[in-house]
Amino acid sequence: MEFSHYSVMLKECIDALDIKPNGIYVDCTAGGGGHSEAILERLDSGKLISLDQDDEAIETCKKRLARFGERSIIVKSNFSELERVLNELEIVHIDGVLMDLGVSSHQLDTPSRGFSYNSDAELDMRMNPRSPFSAYDVVNTYSEQELKKIIFDYGEERFAPQIARKIVLAREENPIKTTLELASIIKNAIPVGAAKKESQHPAKRTFQAIRIEVNHELDVITPAIETAVSRMNIGGRIAIMTFHSLEDRIVKTKYNDYAKACTCPANFPVCVCGNKAKLKVITKKPIIANNEELNENARSRSAKLRVAEKI
C-alpha cells in the first residue's frame, strides 16, 4: 500500500530550519517524504538524511526522493539511533534537524495497523511493524497497576483506575484481541454522564497511552535532542513538532535547559559551574497551524512547532 501522509505545517517547518543550500540536514521522521522533499528542493550541494522506522514509509520516500540522487540518504531507523546513523555515515556535523512526532495519517487510516478505535483490527499500534512488542502485549500482560499508570500518565485519563479494572476483568474471560473490543471495554468503564460531556471518543486517551507505551515515544525524544544539539554546527536549527502536551513539555523543557548559561544556585555570588548556553530558543511560544491548514487537515489542530538555534 502506498504510504500517504499530510505534511503538517510544511512551510513553517522548512522556514524554521533556515536552510543553507550546502548544509547537511536530518529529517528524523520522514513519513511520506513531504518535509524531506521540501528540504531537498532548497539544497544545492547539501545533503539530507531521512529516517523512518516504517517499511512502507521508507519505500515511499525512496520513490519520491529518487530525483535528488546522492543528495538524499534514506535510512530505516528510529530517530533515537541518530548518533549511530551519523557515525555509520561518517557525518560529524549537521546544520539542522526536523522531528515530526505525530503518528502518520497513513498509520492512523490503515485499519490493519491497529491504531484506530473506529475500525476493527488486531491490536497492534507498532510504528515499526517488525517490533516484537505490540498493543496486544500491553493490554493482555500488564498488571492492573501498570495499566492504570500508563493510562493516567500517558493518556492523562482521569478514569484510568476504572479502565484498567475493566480491561483486567475482560481479559480474565478471554484475551482482548481487537481494537473495537478494547474500545468497547473502555467506553463501558467511563461513567455515562462524563462520556456525554466529552467531544472526543471515550477511548482516545487510552489508545494514545497504549500507543506511546508500545513505541516508547516519550523515551526517545530527549536522547535525540541531545544528539542533534551535540552534532549541530553553530547557527544550526532544530525544529520539533509535537501533537500532545506530554511531548511538548519534554521539548520545551529540554530547549530551556540548553538555553541556560549559569546553573549555579541563586545564592552563589559568582558563577562556578562554567556552564554555557548551547541553544537560543527562537519560538518563545510554539507555532501553530493557520486556519487555512486547519480547514484542509483537522489533525493539524493539536500540532505545536518549537524551534531553537545552536549558539
Describe the residue ranges of each PLM region.
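S-adenosyl-L-methionine-dependent methyltransferase catalytic core, i.e., the SAM/SAH-binding region
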Residues: M1-I311
